[in-house]
Amino acid sequence: MMAALYPSTDLSGASSSSLPSSPSSSSPNEVMALKDVREVKEENTLNEKLFLLACDKGDYYMVKKILEENSSGDLNINCVDVLGRNAVTITIENENLDILQLLLDYGCQSADALLVAIDSEVVGAVDILLNHRPKRSSRPTIVKLMERIQNPEYSTTMDVAPVILAAHRNNYEILTMLLKQDVSLPKPHAVGCECTLCSAKNKKDSLRHSRFRLDIYRCLASPALIMLTEEDPILRAFELSADLKELSLVEVEFRNDYEELARQCKMFAKDLLAQARNSRELEVILNHTSSDEPLDKRGLLEERMNLSRLKLAIKYNQKEFVSQSNCQQFLNTVWFGQMSGYRRKPTCKKIMTVLTVGIFWPVLSLCYLIAPKSQFGRIIHTPFMKFIIHGASYFTFLLLLNLYSLVYNEDKKNTMGPALERIDYLLILWIIGMIWSDIKRLWYEGLEDFLEESRNQLSFVMNSLYLATFALKVVAHNKFHDFADRKDWDAFHPTLVAEGLFAFANVLSYLRLFFMYTTSSILGPLQISMGQMLQDFGKFLGMFLLVLFSFTIGLTQLYDKGYTSKEQKDCVGIFCEQQSNDTFHSFIGTCFALFWYIFSLAHVAIFVTRFSYGEELQSFVGAVIVGTYNVVVVIVLTKLLVAMLHKSFQLIANHEDKEWKFARAKLWLSYFDDKCTLPPPFNIIPSPKTICYMISSLSKWICSHTSKGKVKRQNSLKEWRNLKQKRDENYQKVMCCLVHRYLTSMRQKMQSTDQATVENLNELRQDLSKFRNEIRDLLGFRTSKYAMFYPRN
């Protein structure tokens, strides 16, 4: 068989005559017959092959000559090659636009022509296809063709709509052309939507339904499409990234794709903000309020800086946007305010400034309380000064906690209901002030946003414990007036419970200082890493508790045989110097033993000690269980925990600058508004500013019911609408500038990274071929049609 295919030589280069003629030398087991099992298309004629070859080589005059000679219609101008490409597709891939126009004029058709042009990003071909007017009215227009392609039942080589494909390629020019054709895009339904349409699509083909949703979101996440179709591209990028993050948690099969699209939206918002060139543009962008957000009318009339867009970025967890250099520089300017010279001072002067403000913070608070609108009051109102004053107030609270333990009266140790001391009342004032501050934040931020901050959660728990502590002290003082030794008290006596809650609240009070580390570039990343590690430890507990519960059940059933000691013991199990199996007589005791065994605080003997010399099997089973527990928990799970914590720390370390700047921005924003200017306990004193606001609001409400008041209110609303409209117009102007700069920078980046690729070489080859054919035509040379198959060497 091989000799018949290659009569001169075989595969090894030997002559065919040298092959043995014995039939046994060509056994059927030594060869494998190959056969094309795919659908065999009708082979093209010689003219059709010539036609496709001329289109491939870019020979305009040869293509035109073949089409002109096809008056009888013998040539099928829609023929395809072995790859399934027709003349239009080949011409688009080679970027021969003049031949493409010629083919369209002669009626060549291709359902995939527009998709091929978009996929190849040949802008000229897309323009020709969209603007081409066919001679025959029976042919479908481009709009109808796009509608056919968008139909799920229509099958093409690339099963995707043109606008979706253009968005996937992120080609701004092609998308501009397509959007002029009044195209539409199906709106993706929410994940888990149970409407009739989604249920039918999911039931018919769940894979196609999921892939279609992914293609739609790839289109919506295209920066080019966002810039073209959205008036507020930054807000749209925020919303899309949040939706894509939610989809990645539901559509776990396509998690990587959705997470990559979410990162793309975040980077687009960041790159768009990076195009701002001055502080005025940054102020317009970061203070813009969308129509869906609540508006601060008083702040708008007073031209107050609300940083609504920045707060929205933090809400959507846009770390790239917030940590962008322009945004951080603007935040620094707002943070220091009228104390901008503080950053340029020497370190010693910085320390002296902080210590001076920290020592005299009560005097400064009283000055602001009396004259908040004075020059001195405006300086105190700056976020940096508020941070120092609030910090000094909190350190004073911690100092009172230390004094509380130092001045504890030993004479009242056995008093079941001791009275409150002066220092107790001071602590209560501070606690009421901190609670009032949390209530104001809860009122303005809402419950959901308030609980998202771990700092607010810790503050809520801490204040609740302090409230419960002093409430129990009051109850104990009113109910108990006797003296008795503490060992004779009830285990849940109000005084004992109050002392326990107070001790735990003190621990949380000092741990709250961790959040002040966020302002430091050295301690801040460590504090963020610790928070991430605690989250990972919570995930680890889900696995550890299951293992602990499993071994606890086994050991309790093994040793809980109702054995009780006749002697009264002061200790049980691992708490005794001589540990024995009596610790496993209860579920809690077994949990204690297994838990402390991890830290080598429980001896292995308690797992294998026998109640009698005949219970060797029980001892052996106990040894096997503790050995298995030692392997699973002590060796495997603890090492897994170490690996998880190391991974969390490394993840934060790799993005240390971004994570720290984002956390610092969240802390700074809590001091930017004027809701909590004074620290505890001065914030519980009604200030003149608050009284003036209340009187002003009451007078406006009364005047609004009069004729003059209604006119004044309408004028105020009209002024407010004009200011809002003016701000929106300024925002659109700035956004147009940012979009234009973004496109320019992307074009320059593509040009700077443009190198000699296969496409560039192919384009050069086509240009040389066109030039050669034009020279031949000008000189009068005519190439034979069949000479194209056999060119001269």
Swiss-Prot record:
Pfam families reported in the protein's UniProt record: Ion_trans, TRP_2
Membrane topology note: Multi-pass membrane protein
Topological domains, Extracellular: 405-422, 476-496, 559-623
SMART domains: ANK, TRP_2
Keyword Transmembrane helix annotated: yes
InterPro entries (alphabetical): Ankyrin_rpt, Ankyrin_rpt-contain_sf, Ion_trans_dom, TRP_dom, TRPC1_channel, TRPC_channel
Residue intervals passing through the bilayer: 387-404, 423-439, 456-475, 497-517, 537-558, 624-644
Name recorded for this polypeptide: Short transient receptor potential channel 1
